[in-house]
Amino acid sequence: MRAVSGVVRKKKVKKILNMAKGYYGSHSKQMKQAKEAVIRGLKYAYRDRRQKKRMMRRLWTLRINAACRPLGISYSKFINGLKKANVIIDRKALSNLAIDDYKAFEAVVEVAKKALA
């Protein structure tokens, strides 16, 4: 008897079409278009999981810089001052501090300024 790939093929098609749910037009209905769209989507997902980390760090830096400028210090000098003062606070925490508790952030900036002077 001839071996056919009926069951396996149906399972593969179903898997791809399930992954392509919500895609527009033939990308969610036809196997070839769906497979191409899913592969492209997975490539973007892989790439963007890595880019997300870079983008978040850039956002934190931007926020810290924006909070430092009115207090008369640039971002680079602020970070340098923190390093000299042996203050170990990561950029995410500093960013949250600048947004949520500005008074505490001002105190941290003063510590950095004293270390630079």
UniProtKB/Swiss-Prot annotation:
Pfam families: Ribosomal_L20
A single BP term in Gene Ontology: translation
Zinc-finger recorded as keyword: no
Cited InterPro entries: Ribosomal_bL20, Ribosomal_protein_bL20_C
GO cellular component, one term: ribonucleoprotein complex
GO terms assigned for molecular function: rRNA binding; structural constituent of ribosome
Superkingdom, natural source: Bacteria
Record keywords, A-Z: Ribonucleoprotein, Ribosomal protein, RNA-binding, rRNA-binding
Family statement: Belongs to the bacterial ribosomal protein bL20 family.
Record's function text: Binds directly to 23S ribosomal RNA and is necessary for the in vitro assembly process of the 50S ribosomal subunit. It is not involved in the protein synthesizing functions of that subunit.
PANTHER family from the UniProt entry: 39S RIBOSOMAL PROTEIN L20 (PTHR10986)
Protein name (Swiss-Prot/TrEMBL): Large ribosomal subunit protein bL20
Lineage, opening ranks: Bacteria, Pseudomonadati, Spirochaetota, Spirochaetia, Brachyspirales
Gene behind the chain: rplT
